[in-house]
């Protein structure tokens, strides 16, 4: 059973996948910052890879008031790095729709290597085949 308000630790993998799908569908139908923030929230804890193939995930902490902060904490090995929501929004506005050769093509923005990996996983950008090999998704989706 899926309850939209249920914490992700308490729902099944299938329900979590549905939650992410619905958030992305909502954003594609109405591409507002608020709806994209919903996508970011649902993908917290999911594994991504950078341009060079290094794995990472992110978490979003809650502030004293119980609301989520607009800061992503990138979990890479032993250290965490913060990534500001404003950086993600800036990069989002720089997507032109074509294959994005490298992270800096989306702008000289702090944390871009992580944003690039996230945008690829979200299906917002395409990357060259040699980069797909590193990022682990070279499969042709139409070949089945």
Each language-model region and where it sits:
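Short, contiguous, well-structured surface segments enriched in hydrophobic/aromatic residues
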Residues: 79-83
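Short acidic DE-rich linear segments
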Residues: 143-144
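Long, low-complexity, charged/polar intrinsically disordered regions in eukaryotic proteins
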Residues: 20-78
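Basic nucleic-acid-binding interfaces
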Residues: 27-43, 90-106, 117
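Short, compact, well-ordered microdomains
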Residues: 95-140
């Amino acid at each position: 059973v899926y309850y939209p308000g249920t914490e992700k630790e308490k729902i099944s993998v299938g329900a979590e996948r549905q939650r992410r799908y619905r958030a992305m569908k909502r954003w594609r139908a109405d591409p507002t910052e608020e709806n994209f923030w919903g996508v970011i929230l649902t993908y917290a804890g999911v594994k991504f890879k950078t341009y060079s193939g290094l794995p990472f995930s992110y978490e979003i902490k809650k502030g004293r008031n119980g609301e989520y902060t607009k800061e992503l904490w990138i979990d890479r090995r032993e250290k965490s790095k913060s990534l500001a929501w404003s950086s993600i929004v800036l990069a989002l506005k720089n997507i032109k729709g074509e294959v994005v050769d490298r992270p800096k093509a989306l702008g000289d923005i702090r944390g871009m290597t992580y944003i690039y990996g996230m945008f690829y996983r979200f299906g917002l950008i395409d990357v060259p085949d040699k980069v797909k090999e590193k990022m682990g998704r070279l499969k042709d989706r139409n070949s089945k």
